[in-house]
Amino acid sequence: MEVRHNWTVAEVQTLMDKPFMDLIFEAQLVHRKYQQANHVQVSTLLSIKTGACPEDCKYCPQSAHYRTDVDRERLMEVESVLDAAKKAKNSGSTRFCMGAAWKNPKERDMPYLLDMIKGVKEMGLETCMTLGMITAEQAGELSEAGLDYYNHNLDTSPEFYGNIITTRTYQDRLDTLSHVRDAGMKICSGGIIGMGESASDRAGLFVELANLPQHPESVPVNMLVKVKGTPLEDAEDVDPFDFIRLIAVARIMMPESAVRLSAGRESMNEQMQALCFMAGANSVFYGCKLLTTPNPDEDTDMQLFKKLGVNSEQVAQKPDQIQEHELLDRVAERVAARPNKDDLFYEASV
């Protein structure tokens, strides 16, 4: 399998329709050719500005268009962000991602954002931001400050996109990705599964990503988290096997990219997550919350990694150089002390 940029939707649908075992086997072969086996990269995501977003993304509890339980918060102080980054590093993350609920960053906010980037970089962490649409000039400023990654998801296929968002065009998203790449930063871009899209739309999303001039370095695959108050609160559940298939397809189509299990992981049981890793996922967000939605806690993740024999990148880069077996033993003790060990499992149907 060679790295390609000329996929078609029909070709991807044929790939998706392969027998499950054959597809997973093919994805694992590709994974071991291009990626480090039994290895997961760990990132932490912090919401640095929450709620009151003018966009109308139907999946998002931070949109000002919908009534949800998300509290509106102003842009965090730089020192508060740096304190959170220190905690993330001490918990084992190697990349610190900062997200702001904006259509686009205002010029008055740029100095604070640049200081956040510089401060996090000084800790030895990789940096990532998601701030909405950015101009070429803003991309240059972020890059000069040391930003490693910029996240801007395509969300779904061009054909289905208008059913989910009307306040930002698909081309707006592609233009932002172009600005990011031209500024020399790495791209984090993926989509959301479970918004009512068809199999063809799912294939179309991955075609758009894989046919970019250069594949995104990181491809987050989100499973919709249904939030009360949003138009998609009653969306149909995603079939776990369909989701795992899509992880495998992403791995085959973008073999050199990190494929990240992102939102929705809280509702996946251990077995589903294990199959996702087998299908080629090799990155996760670490911590109990992703922006405003739940995420498995750190102890649970480390326990799962231990069961699977997975080495997380974060262990070797802990500031105090705690060895992996020592950390895992401590985690096991903490988990064993819990009153209910069933907390290690999640119902995929929830």
UniProtKB/Swiss-Prot annotation:
* Sequence positions that bind [4Fe-4S] cluster: 53, 57, 60
* Cofactor needs: [4Fe-4S] cluster; [2Fe-2S] cluster
Q: Return the EC number.
A: 2.8.1.6
Q: Which reaction does it catalyse?
A: (4R,5S)-dethiobiotin + (sulfur carrier)-SH + 2 reduced [2Fe-2S]-[ferredoxin] + 2 S-adenosyl-L-methionine = (sulfur carrier)-H + biotin + 2 5'-deoxyadenosine + 2 L-methionine + 2 oxidized [2Fe-2S]-[ferredoxin]
Enzyme superclass (EC): transferase
Alphabetical list of CDD domains matching this protein: Radical_SAM (cd01335)
Please share the entry's free-text remark on the cofactor. Binds 1 [4Fe-4S] cluster. The cluster is coordinated with 3 cysteines and an exchangeable S-adenosyl-L-methionine. Binds 1 [2Fe-2S] cluster. The cluster is coordinated with 3 cysteines and 1 arginine.
**Top-level lineage group:** Bacteria
**UniProt KW keywords:** 2Fe-2S, 4Fe-4S, Biotin biosynthesis, Iron, Iron-sulfur, Metal-binding, S-adenosyl-L-methionine, Transferase
Residues of the signal sequence? none
- Where exactly are the transmembrane stretches of this chain? none
GO process annotations (BP)? biotin biosynthetic process
- Domain Radical SAM core per the UniProt entry, residue ranges: 38-256
Report residues binding [2Fe-2S] cluster. 97, 128, 188, 260
Metabolic or biological pathway, per its Swiss-Prot or TrEMBL entry: Cofactor biosynthesis; biotin biosynthesis; biotin from 7,8-diaminononanoate: step 2/2
User: What Gene Ontology terms describe what this protein does at the molecular function level?
Assistant: 2 iron, 2 sulfur cluster binding; 4 iron, 4 sulfur cluster binding; biotin synthase activity; iron ion binding
Mind telling me which PANTHER family this protein's record contains? BIOTIN SYNTHASE (PTHR22976), BIOTIN SYNTHASE, MITOCHONDRIAL (PTHR22976:SF2)
Sorted alphabetically, which NCBIfam families does this protein's record hold?
A: bioB
Q: Which HAMAP family match?
A: BioB
What function does this protein fulfil? Catalyzes the conversion of dethiobiotin (DTB) to biotin by the insertion of a sulfur atom into dethiobiotin via a radical-based mechanism.
Q: How does it assemble?
A: Homodimer.
Q: Which family does it belong to?
A: Belongs to the radical SAM superfamily. Biotin synthase family.
Provide the protein name: Biotin synthase
Q: Which gene encodes it?
A: bioB
